From Swiss-Prot:
Record's protein name: Nucleotide-binding protein Bcep18194_A5887
Annotated keywords: Nucleotide-binding
Source organism superkingdom: Bacteria
Family, as annotated: Belongs to the YajQ family.
Transmembrane domains' residue ranges: none
Paired cysteines (S-S): none
Function, as annotated: Nucleotide-binding protein.
C-alpha cells in the first residue's frame, strides 16, 4: 500500500551556509563599516545584531536574500521582537520552525478527507502520513496540498510502494 509523509523542515546545513555568507557580506559592505552587525546561530535559533533599526533591517534583508539563493523558504523563519542591548545596540531572535504543528496537521487531514480521494491521512508526531491504494491518488493529494496550503512550506518524503 503506497504512502508518504507530509513534513515541514528547513535544511539546516543550507541555513548555516546562508548565515556564513550573510556575515561575510556584512563584514565587507561599506554601510556596515565600523558597526557590530552580524548573525549568530545556536541550533534552530538565529540572533541578528545591529547598531540601529535601519541596520537591523539591512541585516534581515541580507539574510533573507542569502536564504532565498540557497533555496530555503523564508516562511520557516519566526521573528521575535527587537530587544535593546548595551548602548544603542539591538538584537532580534529568529527561530527556524520545524515540524507540522497540531493545527496545521488537523487542517491537512481535514483537506485530505474533504477531497473525496480514496486515501487515509493520520497524524504521526510532527508529520502527517497519507496512505492510499494507488500512486495516482497520492500524487493528486500532493498537488491538492501544494495548492491549498500556502502559509507553511510543505515537503513530501518517505515514499513507500
Amino acid at each position: 500500500m503506497p504512502s508518504f509523509d507530509v513534513v515541514s523542515e528547513a535544511n539546516m546545513i543550507e541555513v548555516k551556509n546562508a548565515i556564513e555568507q550573510s556575515n561575510k557580506e556584512i563584514s565587507t559592505r561599506f554601510d556596515f563599516k565600523g558597526s557590530d552587525a552580524r548573525v549568530e546561530q545556536k541550533e534552530r535559533e538565529l540572533t541578528l545584531f545591529a547598531d540601529d533599526d535601519f541596520k537591523l533591517g539591512q541585516v534581515k534583508d541580507v539574510l533573507i536574500g542569502k536564504l532565498a539563493k540557497r533555496n530555503v523558504d523564508v516562511r520557516f523563519l519566526d521573528y521575535g521582537k527587537v530587544e535593546k542591548i548595551g548602548g544603542d545596540k539591538l538584537k532580534q531572535i529568529v527561530t527556524v520552525k520545524k515540524g507540522v504543528t497540531g493545527d496545521l496537521a488537523k487542517k491537512i487531514v481535514r483537506l485530505v478527507k474533504d477531497s473525496k480521494i480514496k486515501v487515509q491521512a493520520s497524524i504521526q508526531g510532527d508529520a502527517v502520513r497519507v496512505n492510499g491504494t494507488k500512486r495516482d491518488d497520492l500524487q493528486s493529494v500532493i498537488a491538492m496540498l501544494r495548492k491549498d496550503v500556502t502559509d507553511t512550506p510543505l515537503d513530501f518524503n518517505n515514499f513507500r510502494d
